[in-house]
A protein has these predicted regions:
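Outer-membrane beta-barrel porins/channels
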Residues: 2-400
Length: 400
């Protein structure tokens, strides 16, 4: 799996603003008096002091940079917590990294009709994302204007292990028809996340900066945990027609809502509830064909469909899943499809393959959670993402 990509989005906000999500975080943390709120503003380090553990980092950063304000009555009780009106916003991200898999397998067959195999898989994850979100905003119909920029750096590393077992059976001795069954155990990942953030605001009265490197040990937040993926089940069928055309089809199911998140001691994390509510079962279907057009050349074609793993109403709820995270953006993926065609050559000494692959999917991108109106409709319209990837693959080898 290759994570390398860049993404950019820009558009009007019609009054929606990330600052209101920050304000909701402060409200949800139970700030009820001016003394409580001013204590957050005056604290030496609200990101590590135990009295502020219930305050999400992003909410605290917004309050301490003037993006979140409060009104209170003559008794000091807070009557309103609010942000700014967003004019327009601009987002950019750059991602790098990959998941590498190393397989160790054994296999055997019985009478060339019953084939059995087992594979031990070892995985290595290395992922880095830098993102920047900037917003122009106003108050009182433009009488006061300002802007802010939120930069996030997120890195995760990990290793995992799983076991795959499967069988292929030719039920009829003189027929090329075959079917297969395979089961993949959950992948047990040991993960380590490291992230930091900088929020800078430019307001009519003054400017503020909150750099988490100045408050966190080692300059970043570090979190070690376990992720256990769901079981995966696979069935396949295949045959040969006329001695020259190979056909195969494959179906796979994986219930993403069964993914487990645990701390290093094996205790379930808060984000587990969000996994169950926002992820769902994924269905994958593949078909392929290869035909020999001569003794040396063959042509190939294939199609792959994969359903979306995310429910249509999913959103990123930072206070519930992990209140130390400051990257509010999220992407709700739709189904994914891929089409490929290829040509193969098999000579006495040299063999070669060339293939073209077209991979495409859609998604809804949100720079932040804008919430719902009274009718239950999203206040922030998503950015419609159309992702297309074209690949030309070439392989050449020599027989010894």
């Amino acid at each position: 799996v290759n994570f390398n990509r860049q993404f950019a989005s820009k558009g009007g906000l019609n009054g929606n603003s990330l600052t209101w999500q920050m304000a909701d975080m402060i409200d949800g943390a139970g700030y009820q008096t001016d003394n409580h709120f001013n204590g957050l503003l005056d604290a030496n380090n609200p990101y590590t002091e135990s009295s502020f553990y219930d305050t999400p980092y992003l909410g605290a950063m917004g309050a301490r940079t003037g993006l979140v304000d409060v009104d209170w009555d003559d008794k000091g009780n807070i009557t309103k917590i609010y942000g700014w009106e967003g004019i327009d916003g601009e987002y950019y991200s750059r991602e790098t990294g990959s998941i590498n898999e190393y397989d160790f397998n054994v296999s055997f067959n019985v009478r060339d009709r019953f084939y059995f195999g087992a594979t031990l898989g070892v995985y290595d994850i290395d992922y880095l994302r830098y993102s920047s979100y900037g917003e122009n905003m106003q108050r009182l119909n433009g009488e006061y204007q300002g802007n802010f920029t939120l930069n996030n750096t997120y890195k995760t590393e990990g290793t995992g292990i799983d076991l795959k077992v499967g069988t292929i059976i030719r039920p009829f001795e003189y027929s090329p028809f075959r079917f297969g069954l395979a089961i993949h155990t959950p992948i047990l990942y040991n993960m380590s996340d490291r992230y930091t953030s900088v929020l800078a605001s430019n307001l009519p009265s003054d400017s503020h900066v909150q750099n988490l490197k100045d408050f966190l040990y080692g300059g970043q937040y570090t979190w070690d945990y376990r992720m256990i993926t769901p079981w995966r089940f696979n069935v396949s069928v295949g045959t040969i027609v006329g001695g020259i055309m190979a056909l195969d089809a494959e179906y796979e199911f994986e219930n993403y809502s069964a993914t487990k998140l645990q701390n290093a001691e094996g205790v379930e994390l808060n984000g587990q509830s969000a996994v169950k509510e926002t992820l769902k079962g994924v269905h994958s279907f593949r078909v392929g064909m290869e035909t020999k057009v001569s003794s040396a050349f063959s042509v190939r074609a294939g199609y792959h469909f994969r359903s979306t793993p995310i429910t249509s109403d999913a959103f990123k709820n930072i206070p519930v899943t992990d209140n130390t995270r400051t990257d509010a953006e999220y992407l709700n993926l739709k189904s994914r499809q891929a089409v490929s065609v290829g040509l193969g050559y098999r000579g006495r000494l040299v063999y070669a393959d060339v293939a073209y692959k077209y991979d495409f999917y859609k998604g809804d991108f949100y720079a932040f959670d804008g919430g719902l109106d009274q009718s239950g409709n999203l206040l922030l319209s998503p950015t419609k993402v159309n992702n297309e990837r074209h690949q030309l693959l070439f392989t050449i080898g020599v027989h010894f």
